[in-house]
């Protein structure tokens, strides 16, 4: 075995789950460990495309309540236990998913990020909602000039986070990111799946239709019945906000589907740029089938 731990990451709908299934069938002694921040929630297996899991092989999927504000720090604690358990039982841990913050924190160590007050979060959220994309970007740059070279104008989530941090602390988010805890492990190999965009966009569109057919609307109904705060992570999973609007009568089902597909495609586009620049040691694979054929262990 070349590396004790394998990381398989990549953009959404790139075939990571199917690849892990194929590798498990090929090698057998594998523990597949989730690093998708939304696939941890047990109430939304369909809309987050969780694998049809067998507990002995799939770990950290669908085990957290949607009521919880699960964090990367908690995930790292759970991950460490699962990786060690796999190694102790002569299994190969495969960490897989597309949450960039989770992957980055595993590889580089967890950043000591500050707590952000609810008041600051609310104010930034209102600004993001009420300003145009260009106006919001200009505002963030006026507070933190370092953003210009590091965050693109279309990445509203990271721009909001940067504005929250500098508003709360007076320091740029990039200073906080440099202050990291040591990584949990260093004996890993990372592969990044970046297929052709057209193929991914087509899969995103068809996959969301299948989610609707398989019961995604009922999942979101259950979330609404739980009276969850709209800022909880589970309520922000791709497709959930759009279906919520449909269930409240604000848009039609066709509109909800189209908007969710568009938003997910935009997310995939941002992921392309992010993954290409973040992990220089990663081996980039165009197609998941290529990796299945490789002798990666």
From Swiss-Prot:
Q: Which residues does substrate bind?
A: 12-17
A biological process (GO) of this protein is: tRNA modification
Q: Return the broad EC class.
A: transferase
EC number per UniProt: 2.5.1.75
Note the Gene3D superfamilies from the entry.
1.10.20.140, P-loop containing nucleotide triphosphate hydrolases
Q: Which cofactor does it need?
A: Mg(2+)
> Record's Pfam families?
IPPT
The answer to whether the entry has keyword Hydrolase is no
Binding, ATP: 10-17
Q: What does this protein do?
A: Catalyzes the transfer of a dimethylallyl group onto the adenine at position 37 in tRNAs that read codons beginning with uridine, leading to the formation of N6-(dimethylallyl)adenosine (i(6)A).
Identification of the protein by name: tRNA dimethylallyltransferase
Q: Gene of origin?
A: miaA
């Amino acid at each position: 075995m070349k590396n004790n731990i394998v990381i398989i990451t990549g953009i959404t709908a790139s075939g990571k789950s199917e690849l892990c299934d194929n590798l498990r069938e090929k090698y057998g002694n594998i523990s597949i460990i989730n690093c998708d921040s939304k696939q941890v929630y047990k109430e939304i297996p369909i809309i987050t495309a969780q694998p049809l899991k067998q507990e002995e092989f799939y770990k950290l999927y669908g085990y957290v309540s949607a009521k919880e504000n699960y964090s990367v720090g908690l995930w790292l604690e759970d991950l460490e236990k699962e990786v060690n358990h796999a190694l102790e039982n002569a299994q190969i841990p495969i960490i897989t998913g597309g949450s960039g913050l989770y992957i980055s924190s595993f590889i580089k160590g967890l950043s000591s990020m500050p707590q952000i007050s609810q008041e600051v979060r609310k104010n930034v959220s209102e600004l993001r909602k009420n300003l145009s994309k260009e106006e919001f970007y200009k505002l963030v740059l006026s507070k933190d000039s370092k953003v210009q070279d590091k965050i693109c104008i279309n990445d509203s989530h990271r721009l909001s986070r940067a504005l929250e941090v500098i508003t709360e602390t007076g320091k740029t988010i990039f200073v906080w990111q440099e202050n990291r805890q040591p990584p949990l492990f260093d004996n890993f190999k990372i592969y990044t799946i970046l297929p052709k965009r057209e193929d991914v966009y087509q899969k995103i569109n068809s996959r969301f239709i299948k989610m609707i057919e398989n019961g995604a609307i009922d999942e979101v109904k259950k979330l609404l019945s739980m009276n969850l705060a709209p800022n909880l992570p589970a309520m922000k999973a791709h497709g959930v906000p759009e279906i919520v609007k449909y269930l409240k009568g604000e848009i039609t089902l066709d509109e909800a589907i189209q908007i969710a597909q568009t938003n997910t495609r935009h997310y995939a586009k941002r992921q392309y740029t992010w993954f290409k620049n973040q992990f220089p040691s990663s081996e980039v694979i165009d197609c998941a089938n290529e990796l299945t054929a490789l002798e990666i262990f």
